[in-house]
Structure formats: C-alpha cells, structure tokens
C-alpha cells in the first residue's frame, strides 16, 4: 500500500489561533464554490477547529458576509 494514503495533513490554522467569523477571506478557503463547508478530512483541521469553523461560517452567513448558496455554481 502506498504511504501517501495515510499521510497526516498539517492543520492550515495554528492550534491556538481563533477562527473569526468576520475574516471572510480565511473562511472562503474552507467552503466549496457552491457554498458548502468542506469536511475535516479535506481541510486538515482538528475536531475542535472544525467545530469552530462551522460556527464561524454559519455566523458569517447569518449576518450576510457569506452567501448560503452561490448563485453562479
């Protein structure tokens, strides 16, 4: 079996850094073109970071910083 299947990804966000719902550019890295939140296995985030990311994206959607769905996609 190739070792690349089991290679651990490093988290793109440092463990101590907070995920801010007002930082739209950072949040856009973790959503698809259609506006869906990427799963943890693709983002490389820890479980806590993924929960915080989900909360931040949902807050940004509620206050209209991010769209719920992308009309172009």
UniProtKB/Swiss-Prot annotation:
Part of the 30S ribosomal subunit. Forms a tight heterodimer with protein bS6. Belongs to the bacterial ribosomal protein bS18 family. It comes from Prochlorococcus marinus (strain SARG / CCMP1375 / SS120). PROSITE patterns: RIBOSOMAL_S18. Binds as a heterodimer with protein bS6 to the central domain of the 16S rRNA, where it helps stabilize the platform of the 30S subunit. PANTHER family: 30S RIBOSOMAL PROTEIN S18, SMALL RIBOSOMAL SUBUNIT PROTEIN BS18M. Keywords: Ribonucleoprotein, Ribosomal protein, RNA-binding, rRNA-binding. It comes from the Bacteria. Gene3D superfamilies: Ribosomal protein S18. One of its GO terms (biological process) is translation. GO terms for cellular component: cytosolic small ribosomal subunit. Disulfide bonds: none annotated. This is Small ribosomal subunit protein bS18. InterPro entries: Ribosomal_bS18 (IPR001648), Ribosomal_bS18_CS (IPR018275), Ribosomal_bS18_sf (IPR036870). The keyword Cell membrane does not apply. The keyword Ribonucleoprotein applies. HAMAP family: Ribosomal_bS18. Signal peptide: none annotated. GO terms for molecular function: small ribosomal subunit rRNA binding; structural constituent of ribosome.
